[in-house]
Every structure is written in C-alpha cells, then in structure tokens.
UniProtKB/Swiss-Prot annotation:
Keyword Transmembrane helix: no
Name of the molecule in the record: Gene product 38
Function, as annotated: Involved in escape from killing mediated by the bacterial AbiQ protein upon infection of L.lactis subsp. lactis strain IL1403. 11 distinct mutations in the protein and 2 in the ribosome-binding site confer on the virus the ability to partially escape killing (i.e. the virus grows in the bacteria), in some cases probably by decreasing the protein level.
Cystine residue pairs: none
Length: 71
C-alpha cells in the first residue's frame, strides 16, 4: 500500500514521462515494472488503471490514440 505522498510521486513520474517526454510506451512499461501493492489487489488494479488512463489521455493530447482511451 502506498502513502498519499508515494502515490503523488508515482503519478508525477508517469505524468512527466507521458506528457513532457511523450514517452507513452515507456510510461506503460514503467507502470508494469514498478507499481505493485501486494496486500491490496483491488486497490492496486484501480491505481494501475488510473495511471494507464492518465497516459492514454496525455497521448491523446498529442494525437496518439491507445485502445480504451475513450472508455
């Protein structure tokens, strides 16, 4: 389980990778390799889903569409 500060740091990293660097695939890979909350599976899945949605929205701002971005 992440503290609120840790969650903000993770969101900031993902946001910077996907928005400032436009490294959308790298952001998805970073999420996959670095985000895990072993004692809160439902919370982990929701947090990961929210992070991926952030990347998809940032990609859309640059005209790149990932599947599921409009869901």
């Amino acid at each position: 389980m992440y503290t609120a500060e840790e969650r903000e740091q993770i969101i900031d990293i993902v946001d910077k990778m996907s928005l400032l660097r436009q490294d959308f695939d790298g952001a998805f890979t970073w999420i996959k390799e670095n985000v895990a909350m072993p004692f809160d599976f439902d919370g982990e899945q929701q947090f990961i889903s929210d992070l991926k949605q952030l990347v998809k929205i940032n990609a859309l701002k640059f005209g790149k569409i990932y599947e599921g971005v409009l869901n």
